[in-house]
Amino acid sequence: MKLNNAVLSQSLPGYALPQYDRQAMARRSRQQPTWLHFGAGNLFRAFPAVLAQRLLNAGETDTGVLCCEAYDTDAVTQFLRPYDDLTLSVSLLADGSMEKEVVGSIAQSLTLPQDRCRVEEIFRAPSLQMVSFTITEKGYAVNAAVKEDMGRAPGEAQTLLGALAACCLARFEACGAPLALVSMDNCSQNGEKLREGFFAMLDAWKAAGHVSPEAYAWAQEKLSFPWSMIDKITPRPHESVQKALAADGWEGMDIQVTGKNTYIAPFVNTEKPQYLVIEDDFPAGRPPLEKAGVLFTSRDTVNAVERMKVCTCLNPLHTALAIFGCLLGHTSIAGEMADPDLRDFVTTMAYEEGMPVVIDPGVIEPKAFLEEVLTQRFPNPFIPDTPQRIATDTSQKLPIRFGVDMGLHLERGTAGQLQRIALVLAGWLRYLKAVDDQGQPFTCSPDPLLEKVQPIAQAIPFGTQATQEDFGSLLEDASIWGVDLKAAGLSALVVEDFNRLNQGPGAVRTTLEQLRKG
């Protein structure tokens, strides 16, 4: 059994199928496009494309989504087009069962720069309402390639930001209709990051005489850049899912690694819980995505949801598990949640130190969100996520994931009660020694500050006691912790905790066990 249009007319027990005329949908979508998405990777195929299918199945819309890939074009040329732009989406439930769906909402798949003319044609269409993005935070950066595009004419742009700006200028010339450019990437204030990158390009072209005052004014007035918060764990395709699909009779489900080091397959595997909250700023209208569970609200509320998740209810727990998981030799987040000491640690940290200062966004109840994280999402053994992956770039994550809540506790005068948050910070210093709890060496995950901070921790011998002076000015560096730990009155506690964790083999386990038993 092959994944192509022919399979849609077959009976497939155990699979949800498109409930619409796919050929008619694709024809309408190409002629009168409403939604274009950049970034044809796993997250897009597991989430936005499935949202589009929900609307099509319910008869809430008659057009799907067109997608374009500008970074890793193999995602389109090898994993969409050969399969008639169909995808198998597999939700991995905590009880080991799978919910499987053939997703047919992708009406056309394109690549840049190869399909530049077609992409520009889509932008010229007055029917186009929104252009969305899952291109990672790095995709919005004004890097060397983008700067080269600033020196070219719009028609010669090579980067995604350059092509986007050029296509918007083409829209101005063709119809002048407004448009929403919607980042759906998992980073704070994502709409602002997209807007800054876009206008950096437009400003350079305006200075070079490539953009008229009228076109520039149109871009400022008629283009919107809504903020969003997206949350859905979508790990790389997993061999266990591949085997299950093969057992169902599917052919050609091989997992491959592209030249850009993307792990990809004709299927995607993901968790079932999902959240997408978007600032409701769509000057050209939008698909009725609220009918598929998307929350539309104000920018302030989007920001509040992001803070709830990133500063309290999910990301700090992930980082705590990453640090202690690496020290204790764990290789999966689910495995850590089966460890009584670690499960108790993150649960108590969340409820006793996070929830008292949590930002309540109003549209999502923090306690219910946290409960789902602790009881369904993290313990799911079929989501193959690792502490080693999450430990990447920890120095860049600590200020947001812990610094914000520490700052709120400081304002309330309760920072001295942060027993577990302080232990996480001490745990990271202990992690930097690259010696696990058995005294065996391991390799720290990549981190841009590793060369700066690791020598400080490694200068303190394993099994010895440190003083605050041994850490120099590190404990006062608010760019790492989010607050000056010394000024906050937490540096002594962090060093004391470090010494407990650094006593010798088994000290990390003993410390966590003692905390659990009180």
Residue ranges and their predicted role:
Residues 1-518:
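Substrate/ligand-engaging "lid" and interaction regions
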